[in-house]
Swiss-Prot record:
Protein name per its UniProtKB record: Defensin-like protein 90
Membrane-crossing residue ranges in chain numbering: none
Similarity comment: Belongs to the DEFL family.
Compartments where located: Secreted
Length: 78
């Protein structure tokens, strides 16, 4: 009984530790989004690269249409 309880507590602790580490390891991304009616990501990625965004971008589809979001290398100035 004690072994099972210890295993459960240890497993739970390791899972929480992994969740905390994974959130710390992935920095927040910043995007410059333009509503252009995109449908797929490849044309949007090429558009972002041609506009000077080295990481490209992705097309996000919302209820009001497609939005091309270019990946910024750092947080934009306010």
């Amino acid at each position: 009984m004690t072994t099972k309880m210890f295993s459960y507590v240890l497993l739970h602790s390791l899972m929480m530790f992994a969740i905390i580490l994974s959130s710390m390891g992935s920095p927040e991304k910043y995007y410059d989004c333009k509503q252009d009616g995109c449908i797929t990501t490849p044309p949007c990625w090429r558009k972002c690269v041609s506009m000077g965004y080295p990481k490209g971008g992705e097309c996000r589809i919302y209820s009001y249409g497609g939005v091309c979001c270019c990946d910024l290398t750092s947080k934009p100035p306010n």
